[in-house]
């Protein structure tokens, strides 16, 4: 085998290893964000604080390694920090007990012993680490408000019966919620993510909107292109493929 062929084979093998590692990392992040949303529901978190917790998690791991930091500890700290950022007070003890029950559904709540206080200290220290890693930039603009605006615009283009018989709003909101399971939520502008969630919901139910000189999505969001919509939509659909792999 020539030197060039050997080098090419080695490069392909390295790419294959990286690709396999990327898939495993994506699976881990998906599972951890599912953990955030499920524990968030049990803690009574509102949708925006839960979204903030997921964004904190994804932002942290944009520059941190899964091989160094325990993802579920980062997630617990992200939940704790998100409650502060979004002004929804969450007791540390409640977070610990709900998360403990997630992993040990048949066990009793942790007693206030050494194990509890050790975990509490770890959450607090990891929260400080997240703050430093993100340079204390922990307030984010979420796509929810944009989606509500776009829904009103689209609703005005449909007749009342067409709107009422298709769950466009519910589906778009569900897609938006699901987007936080992957890093798609931090790779794109919030208004672009909101519009694509609505675009996907309309496509799902085959709803056609009246056409004018511009497409409806050009009217409601002038700075997005069809290529960007397709890119984001592809990333969203990949999350649903990931869900099947993580069950």
Swiss-Prot record:
GO terms for cellular component: nucleus. Gene3D superfamilies: Cyclin-like. Keywords: Cyclin. GO terms for molecular function: cyclin-dependent protein serine/threonine kinase regulator activity. InterPro entries: Cyclin-like_dom, Cyclin-like_sf, Cyclin-Q_first_cyclin_box, Cyclin-Q_second_cyclin_box, Cyclin/Ssn8, Cyclin_N. GO terms for biological process: regulation of transcription by RNA polymerase II. Belongs to the cyclin family. Cyclin-like FAM58 subfamily. May be an activating cyclin for the cyclin-associated kinase CDK10. This is Cyclin-Q.
């Amino acid at each position: 085998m020539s030197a060039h062929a050997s080098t090419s084979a080695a490069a392909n093998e390295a790419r294959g290893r990286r690709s396999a590692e990327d898939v495993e990392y994506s699976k881990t992040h998906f599972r951890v964000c599912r953990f955030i949303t499920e524990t968030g529901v049990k803690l009574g978190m509102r949708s925006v604080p839960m979204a903030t917790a997921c964004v904190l998690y994804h932002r942290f791991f944009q520059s941190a390694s899964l091989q160094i930091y325990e993802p579920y500890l980062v997630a617990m700290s992200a939940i704790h920090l998100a409650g502060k950022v979004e002004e929804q007070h969450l007791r540390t003890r409640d977070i610990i007990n709900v998360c403990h029950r997630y992993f040990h559904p048949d066990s009793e709540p942790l007693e206030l012993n050494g194990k509890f206080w050790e975990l509490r200290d770890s959450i607090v220290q990891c929260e400080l680490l997240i703050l430093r890693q993100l340079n204390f930039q922990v307030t984010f603009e979420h796509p929810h408000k944009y989606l509500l605006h776009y829904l009103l615009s689209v609703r005005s283009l449909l007749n009342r019966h067409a709107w009422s018989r298709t769950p466009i709003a519910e589906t778009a909101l569900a897609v938006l919620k699901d987007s936080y399971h992957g890093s798609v939520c931090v790779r794109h502008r919030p208004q672009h993510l909101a519009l694509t969630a609505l675009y996907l919901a309309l496509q799902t139910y085959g709803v056609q909107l009246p056409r004018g000189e511009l497409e409806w999505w050009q009217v409601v969001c002038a700075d997005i292109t069809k290529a960007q919509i397709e890119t984001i939509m592809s990333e969203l659909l990949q999350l649903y493929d990931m869900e099947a792999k993580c069950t």
